[in-house]
Amino acid sequence: MAGQKIRIRLKAYDHEVIDTSARKIVDTVTRTGAKVAGPVPLPTEKNVYCVIRSPHKYKDSREHFEMRTHKRLIDIIDPTPKTVDSLMRLDLPAGVDIEIKL
């Protein structure tokens, strides 16, 4: 797999969970002998939802809720077959969305 690069993009609502997952990935990759660039924090996506507080009237009284999506980017340079195998076996929390590109 010489000359290749694996790009891993992580998304989660909780920043602590995504940081521990990124740390696990970096530790696993460095143990297998590949080079790692990252984790690079990408801009946090913020969605704001506006809801009327009352079920019937009082349109002027509203409540705002927000949902933040934290993102990280990890590049693995010159991965070995052992690196790919260890990444496949890695156990990550359920709240983390993983996107892998070769």
Swiss-Prot record:
Top-level taxon in the UniProt lineage: Bacteria
The record's keywords, sorted A to Z, are: Ribonucleoprotein, Ribosomal protein
Q: Which GO terms describe its cellular component?
A: ribonucleoprotein complex; ribosome
A Pfam family: Ribosomal_S10
> Its GO biological process terms?
translation
Which InterPro entries has this protein been placed in?
Ribosomal_uS10, Ribosomal_uS10_CS, Ribosomal_uS10_dom, Ribosomal_uS10_dom_sf
Provide the GO MF annotations for this entry.
structural constituent of ribosome; tRNA binding
Role, per record: Involved in the binding of tRNA to the ribosomes.
Q: Fill in the subunit field for this protein.
A: Part of the 30S ribosomal subunit.
PANTHER family assigned: 30S RIBOSOMAL PROTEIN S10 FAMILY MEMBER
What the entry lists under NCBIfam families is as follows:
PRK00596.1, rpsJ_bact
Q: What's the family? A: Belongs to the universal ribosomal protein uS10 family.
Q: What name does this protein carry?
A: Small ribosomal subunit protein uS10
Q: What gene is behind this protein?
A: rpsJ
